[in-house]
Amino acid sequence: MTFSTTKSVAMSPDDDAPSFDINSSRRLMSHSEVESRGNGYEVLQQAGTVRILLSRPERGNALSLSLAKDLTQLFQTFSSQHSVHRIVLTGKGKYFCSGMDLGEELYEDATERCLALQDLFGAIDACPKTTVAAINGPAFGGGVGLAFVCDIRVAVSTSFFCLSEVKLGLCPATVSRFIIREWGVSLARMAMLTARKIHPQALQEMGVLHAVALDEEALKVVTENLLDDLGFAAPQASAWCKALTRKTRNGNSDHDQFARQISETMVAPGSESEYGVAQFRRGRKNIRWEQAECLHTR
């Protein structure tokens, strides 16, 4: 089996250099039992990883108003939990997410639906945890936004992304912000105007999809290997990386001041770096941060 790959920013356990070798067959993590269920989703947690599974396969995992609100609450809750380091979002069945549920009262709830989507994408975008979209199938409309608001995206080769709203006399008003940001103006505009399917291989070449797996089983391997790499990334340092990215992306003039604040904080007594550098000096180059003593004394 073959995969298309890119490199990640985390160290592999056997090398000093960053690596994202998804051709290797690392041990698949055994998932815990379902922690909770809601109307259209399931939540599983193991160690520092939370998995959110969209579970409306009969509706293409479409986002109902209630599901959008529930997902927002989940991301807001996990954002404040020290035990959570990563959040994986994926779908059950054929589709990743087919967008907003058009079977609901579209016109009566238009404003509420727009606000619910804005809140959802805002909660994911602002989440200090590393977010991963494991895209198991096609995504339409809001589902495309759901994938590309996440930090890292891996997809099965049979997936595609379609901003099909224009065919219905609509436009992807809420998700366009994130699609334009991640895809660039030219591709995003073409995709919105033509409603053409955008295939994962093209997005991988652009660097906005970070791995493409041959099939769904291979996607599981890709995802677990990525999570294994991310296990070596210190959680607070990861949150700072995301915060710096937001500052730069938004063109904030206070980026340098913010960077100085982080530079001082990250070397303070009791910080992750105090532990990490001490371990490095002892010859231990890779730390499983879920097991790090410094995190358990907080």
From Swiss-Prot:
Which EC number(s) does UniProt give?
4.2.1.-
For the keyword Transport, the answer is no
Task: Please indicate if the UniProt record lists DNA-binding as a keyword.
Answer: no
Q: Which InterPro entries match?
A: ClpP/crotonase-like_dom_sf, Enoyl-CoA_hydra/iso, Enoyl-CoA_Hydratase/Isomerase
**Enzyme class (EC, first level):** lyase
Cite the CDD domains for this sequence: crotonase-like
Q: Where is this region: Disordered?
A: 1-23
Query: What name does this protein carry?
Result: Enoyl-CoA hydratase AKT6-1
